[in-house]
């Protein structure tokens, strides 16, 4: 296993390098620049040139990229162009916990809801319960996150007043864990919706295949209780493909967090990325791209490790 992890880590290096190159090229090709957006049009030519020289914007693009790459390898993501020279690492570390919390809670919600409903749907195939779960899953797959989030805000927050419209905590109040949870419920649920629906369908499909296997019929013939047959003998084998699919869904969690954080004004990396993209804050955009790519690579590696833990027959 250790050799496999090392091999996968080494294989990830050229992938991450390619992502940074592609992101840098696209970013530079986009219209506009931070100087135009943030500087006073009446500023003197000398001050304008000083600004350009300070951030190296007059260097050839490949020189800018190599300088950034060299600093990034040393753990230095540079300073924000728009935010008065604030180190990018400080901006990220201030918002990273909020994004990780949102993704963690969304993941737990998706697993806690999708797996039991998938098992229930497979236990009673083509019943009213199965049709209801299937119908709900298809709706969850079809509804865009941004639209669903806005509907929930309008109904549950604006009209009924059950939840706050956004933010991570109530302004001008001391830290309160229940207040944080209250603010977290809606964005976490919206982020989990699409993946919840997909995982429910995958769990149902895999459980149906497993429940038709000979060893399941043997377990039932021995008189084991149905719940033991379903969860001890059936679910463990049905979860193998689900773990793989869940690893592939990690990019959707990261991409979805960008939309959800913007809608709910959640102060996380997704909102920071969108704000920086509009402001053409190049150092922040590049740092966010690297972090997102690393999270995807690490997430898929964890999925592979869990796959081996669940199924001892698999060796790396």
Swiss-Prot record:
The chain crosses the membrane at residues 10-30, 100-120, 138-158, 177-197, 240-260, 290-310. Keywords: Cell membrane, Competence, Membrane, Peptide transport, Protein transport, Sporulation, Transmembrane, Transmembrane helix, Transport. Pfam families: BPD_transp_1, BPD_transp_1_N. It comes from the Bacteria. GO terms for molecular function: transmembrane transporter activity. SUPFAM superfamilies: MetI-like. One of its GO terms (biological process) is protein transport. It is found in: Cell membrane. InterPro entries: BPD_transp_1_N, MetI-like, MetI-like_sf. GO terms for cellular component: plasma membrane. PROSITE patterns: ABC_TM1. Belongs to the binding-protein-dependent transport system permease family. OppBC subfamily. This protein is a component of an oligopeptide permease, a binding protein-dependent transport system. This APP system can completely substitute for the OPP system in both sporulation and genetic competence, though, unlike OPP, is incapable of transporting tripeptides. Probably responsible for the translocation of the substrate across the membrane. This is Oligopeptide transport system permease protein AppB. The gene is appB.
